Amino acid sequence: MKLLILLFWLIIVFTQTILSQTSIVNVNSYDIDAKLTLNSENLDITLLCQIQPPDSLSEIQFIFSSESKIRSIKYLKDDNWISIPYQFNGKDSLLLLFESGILPDNKYDLRFEYSFPTNLLKDSLVIIDRGHRWYPLMLDQVAPFKFTCDVPKGYQVFAAGDLISVRDHKDNTTFLWESKSAVFKLPLIIFNRTRFKEAAFDSLGIVIDFFYLNADSIEASRVIKEAANSIKFYSEHIGNYPYKKLTLFEVTQWEGINTGSGLIMIGTQSLEMMKQKYYDALNLTIAQQWIGAGVFAKYGSPGFWFLSLSLPHYLRLMYLRQTQGEEYFQQTLKEPLEKYKEFAGKENDIPLINIDSPNSREKGLILYGKGPFVFSKIHKAMGDEKWLSFLQNLYKSFCGKILTYGEFEKQISRYDENGSILALLKKLITQKGIPEE
């Protein structure tokens, strides 16, 4: 049952974004100012985005919701805001046209003024994520951000990163969220606080907040303490958690878990599993705060899913080894691997390096079954001390940055004196099945 739920979560959450894109422009930062009023179904947004092209360009392609109502798009030139012609050249595909072109390596500030539709008046809850394309983005880019959101009094705002300030006014409240470390996505939750119950816990100076609907205080306390234990483990073994806060939020709209940097949205069905003390998905999304939502694999490139899913799964197993013991670790490693072996080497099998999306049961099992097995072999070949040193250096070098598979191999080579570990890794991820040793 646990295996099926976790595989279902893999398929649901990670198939929201299927469009592949390799950007030719670097996104340096976002500064977003948003406002929501009770008499409007739209989120009014002014967004500043700094870009830096590596080459001379006359046009730039963004992924951006076709449902947005754009008022203007401009760029800053000689202290003046100049209008940019634009057009949607496909669904959620926004093309900016620079009549005089833009120069390589220069930094350009873009300003987008637009409104994005919400359903606040229908159910008093706004949940939008990267897959909604609510802000202009490039799929393979990460960037730091600052986000200011003004909402009606009594409403709360959650985003990625840290909550910097809350300012109360007569009829409204202004929230400021920020991440100085780059993030892969900007989720946004706006909700009526009175409808949710809250639990909080302080661990290692990190405030863990849990907002929930379908649990009692004892169940919520167990969930939040499990999250705290996971954070403690990864902080001690890999490196410091990059934020002062982690927010857990129950969502009734889907069944799985959606993870962002500092924000984890828990579907009601997943919460039911946690209430029964099955914490697999929670442990995974906590691990992803280090690798997945802390260190970011290069989206759309070979090895993306192996690094962003299989590696966090193995980190989860490392936590289980310490908390549940070696026998439980081996059992949990073996269970999905046996499921994978049922079709290993056959038509539905795919080399790990070639998986483009976990959009089938078989692909999910390859990532969740074979993937962690591969990391267990690399761990064993390195030895405990070198393996932990490898993880710590990987995190230190790439937290808030994009990690390509090539860079991942370079990091491994520092702990591979005779090349045997890289040779083993290449064999395991480029071939179908479980190659004989």
Predicted segment positions?
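Coil residues (strongly favoring Ser/Thr
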Residues: 56, 79, 92-93, 124, ...
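Extended, low-hydrophobicity, Ser/Thr/Pro/Gly-biased non-transmembrane segments
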Residues: 48, 102, 107-194
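Solvent-exposed beta-hairpin/edge-strand motifs
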Residues: 57-83, 142-155
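Post-HExxH zinc-binding segment in Zn-dependent metallohydrolases
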Residues: 263-264, 268-269, 302-343, 421-425
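Juxtacatalytic substrate-recognition/specificity segment
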Residues: 20, 47-49, 147, 176, ...
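N-terminal, polar/Ser/Thr-rich
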Residues: 16-44, 69, 139
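Amphipathic alpha-helical substructures
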Residues: 364-437
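Bacterial Sec-dependent N-terminal signal peptides
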Residues: 1-23
